[in-house]
C-alpha cells in the first residue's frame, strides 16, 4: 500500500511540474503578447543552481512593468489565475500564498523583480538582465 501511495505521489508531482511548466510558458507568451512589440521581452528558465524558476525580462520591460498600471494588474491577475495562489503586490515584489498538499510546492512563494547588472557585457549586448526569482519562504 505504501509503495502504491509513493508511486501516486510521484505521478502527482510530475503532473504538477508539467502543469507549472505549461503555466510558465503561457505566462511568457501572454506577457510578450500583452506588450504588443515584435521582440521578445520576457522568457523563463529553471535556475540549475537554485532549482527555482525565473522569469527573465529585458531591461526596458524590467524598469517599466510596475509603472504601467494595466500591465502590472494584468500580470498579477494572470499569475493568480494560473497558479491558483493568492497574489499580493508588496512594493517591487509579488507574493503568492497558498496552502498545498505535500507535493513539494512551498506554501509561500516570493517573486522578487530585481535587476542583475553584474555582467556589463550582457548589459551592453542588450541581453536579458531582469529577473523574477521565486524564493521559498
From Swiss-Prot:
Domain of life, per lineage: Viruses
Keyword Hydrolase included in the entry's annotation: no
GO CC terms of this entry: host cell cytoplasm; virion component
Localisation per UniProt entry: Virion; Host cytoplasm
Main location as per UniProt: virion
Keywords: Host cytoplasm, Late protein, Virion
Up-regulation conditions: Expressed in the late phase of the viral replicative cycle.
UniProt entry tagged with the keyword Transferase: no
Subunit structure, as described in the record: Interacts with host TBK1.
Family the entry assigns: Belongs to the asfivirus A137R family.
Described purpose of this protein according to its UniProt entry: Plays a role in the inhibition of the host innate immune response. Mechanistically, promotes the autophagy-mediated lysosomal degradation of host TBK1 and affects IRF3 nuclear translocation to block type I IFN production.
Protein name, as recorded: Structural protein A137R
Amino acid at each position: 500500500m505504501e509503495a502504491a501511495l509513493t508511486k501516486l505521489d510521484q505521478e502527482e508531482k510530475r503532473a504538477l511540474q508539467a502543469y507549472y511548466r505549461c503555466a510558465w510558458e503561457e505566462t511568457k507568451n501572454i506577457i510578450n503578447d500583452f506588450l504588443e512589440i515584435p521582440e521578445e521581452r520576457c522568457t523563463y528558465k529553471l535556475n540549475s543552481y537554485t532549482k527555482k524558476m525565473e522569469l527573465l525580462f529585458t531591461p526596458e520591460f524590467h524598469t517599466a512593468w510596475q509603472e504601467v498600471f494595466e500591465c502590472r494588474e494584468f500580470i498579477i491577475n494572470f499569475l493568480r489565475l494560473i497558479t491558483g495562489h493568492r497574489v499580493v503586490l508588496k512594493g517591487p515584489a509579488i507574493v503568492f500564498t497558498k496552502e498545498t498538499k505535500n507535493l513539494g510546492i512551498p506554501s509561500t512563494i516570493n517573486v522578487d523583480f530585481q535587476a542583475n547588472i553584474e555582467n556589463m557585457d550582457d548589459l551592453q549586448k542588450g541581453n536579458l538582465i531582469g529577473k523574477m526569482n521565486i524564493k521559498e519562504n
